[in-house]
Amino acid sequence: MENKDIRKILPHRYPFLLVDRIIELEEGKRAVGIKNVTSNEPFFQGHFPDNPIMPGVLIVEALAQVAGIAVMNVEEFKGKLGLFAGIDKCRFKKVVRPGDQLILEVSIDSIRMGLVKAKGVAKVGEEIAATAELMFVMAEE
């Protein structure tokens, strides 16, 4: 799924759209996305100018956006908005820097009454950069 197709599903736009491409998608079950981290990212201006590191919270947001694509492409949730309801067991294990390609793997554990629970793993190559359990609620836009 190319970026233009992602923009048809997610409401996020630059500089907060953190998924460049979806390379695997099983609607309502799982998705794998890519974020190519460049030195031009606006967050590197302040985090940190002489030692650029992608903020962990933005890695988690990128995972959430991939989860949103997996769910918001399901017919009953098209046109709805995924709102964060919680983040559990979040761990950061590797620094993400300009030039890295972030692989964002998300599996949907459950969808009940509009509450989505998912697990995400962000990797650079084969190294795990971050893991998290995500919860979000599907709401009307």
UniProtKB/Swiss-Prot annotation:
One of its GO terms (biological process) is fatty acid biosynthetic process. Its main location: cytoplasm. It catalyses: a (3R)-hydroxyacyl-[ACP] = a (2E)-enoyl-[ACP] + H2O. The active site is at residue 47. Disulfide bonds: none annotated. GO terms for cellular component: cytoplasm; membrane. It is an enzyme of class 4 (lyase). Keywords: Cytoplasm, Lipid A biosynthesis, Lipid biosynthesis, Lipid metabolism, Lyase. It comes from the Bacteria. InterPro entries: FabA_FabZ, FabZ, HotDog_dom_sf. Its EC number is 4.2.1.59. It is found in: Cytoplasm. It holds the Pfam family FabA. CDD domains: FabZ. One of its GO terms (molecular function) is (3R)-hydroxyacyl-[acyl-carrier-protein] dehydratase activity. Belongs to the thioester dehydratase family. FabZ subfamily. Involved in unsaturated fatty acids biosynthesis. Catalyzes the dehydration of short chain beta-hydroxyacyl-ACPs and long chain saturated and unsaturated beta-hydroxyacyl-ACPs. This is 3-hydroxyacyl-[acyl-carrier-protein] dehydratase FabZ. The gene is fabZ.
